[in-house]
Regions:
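Extracytoplasmic/periplasmic solute-binding protein
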Residues: 1-44, 79, 88
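Paired acidic/hydrophobic, glycine-rich loop segments that form the ligand-binding mouth/hinge
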Residues: 8, 89-94, 113
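Beta->alpha turn/N-cap motifs
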Residues: 10, 93-101, 132
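Short helix-loop capping/hinge motifs at secondary-structure junctions, enriched
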Residues: 25-30, 61, 139-146
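Glycine-centered hinge/linker elements that transmit conformational signals in sensory
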Residues: 38-69
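Short helix-initiation/N-cap motifs at beta->coil->alpha
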Residues: 68-84
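Extracytoplasmic/periplasmic substrate-recognition and gating elements
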Residues: 103-168, 218
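C-terminal capping/gating helix-and-loop segments adjacent to ligand/active sites or protein-protein/ligand interfaces
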Residues: 168-175, 186-245
Length: 247
């Protein structure tokens, strides 16, 4: 539609989960693990090339013009507000966005929703998921009580309390009772063919001046503004990955 862009993003850092799901969608779970483990020249292969070209096209041809100017820690909510004002259709974000933007103006009929990254194969749709962890220290004095508490976290009562607060436990009833505004962020997992991508880059020995976030994510704004070509972006990411992998 006239005046409506396909895409925007809060800040470049939000592309982490976008890339993780996209790489899984293109190359599969085993390929994703290879990328996260810094396999030699993994970013020069056809899968990574396809992913970077797709994102490059999205950034240079279909992104809301205001995005780069507001893609910083002070103004990023203006890009999220653009989504709510029907100036853009899609935006990578987290389930917290509904609460973060609860007081922002919105167009008539606006409602939050969640979908997967583009599917490369039929019935093979990917989302990146963050899962909070709970564990018992080996030196804990009350391990039995701790185990009882952890078990209780998965009870109907506990999942109901989580749902009331807008969060979901990974149980069969975990999405019941969620506020209507945030429910789509979790009920999407009930859809057939949806796969959850979990994980991130493997911890690696520090290399001075090298960081995957800088190479892969912080370059997004430069690609969007035309200051960095996809080819140079790919070379930059591959170099960082190889150095962190010890190649």
């Amino acid at each position: 539609a006239k005046g409506v862009s396909l895409f925007t993003y809060p800040t470049a850092g939000y592309f982490d989960t976008f890339f993780f799901a996209l790489l899984s969608s293109i190359g599969g779970d085993d390929y994703f693990k290879k990328v996260m483990s810094y396999e030699k020249n993994i970013w020069t292969g056809s899968e990574a090339t396809q992913a970077l070209n797709l994102v490059g096209k999205l950034l240079t041809q279909y992104t809301l013009p205001q995005t780069v100017g507001y893609a910083n820690n002070q103004d990023y909510t203006k890009n999220q507000a653009a989504l709510m004002a029907d100036k853009a259709l899609f935006c990578p974000d987290g389930s917290w966005v509904a609460g973060e933007m609860k007081d922002a103006p919105r167009s008539a009929g606006f409602a939050w929703g969640l979908t997967t990254v583009p599917a490369m194969k039929k019935e093979d749709r990917h989302l990146t998921s963050f899962i909070e962890s709970v564990w018992i220290p080996s030196g804990a004095k009350n391990k039995a009580s701790a185990k009882t508490f952890i078990a209780w976290l998965y009870s109907d009562k506990a999942t109901g309390l989580f749902a009331k607060a807008g969060a979901a436990m990974p149980t069969k009833t975990g999405t019941k009772g969620l506020p209507a505004e945030v429910a789509p962020f979790y009920t999407v997992y009930d859809e057939p063919g949806l796969k959850s991508t979990i994980g991130g880059f493997k911890s690696a020995k520090a290399v001075p001046g090298i960081d995957m976030k800088t190479a892969l994510l912080d370059s997004v704004d430069s690609v969007a503004s035309g200051k960095l070509s996809v080819k140079d972006w790919q070379a930059k990411v591959n170099e960082a990955s190889n150095k962190l992998g010890g190649h």
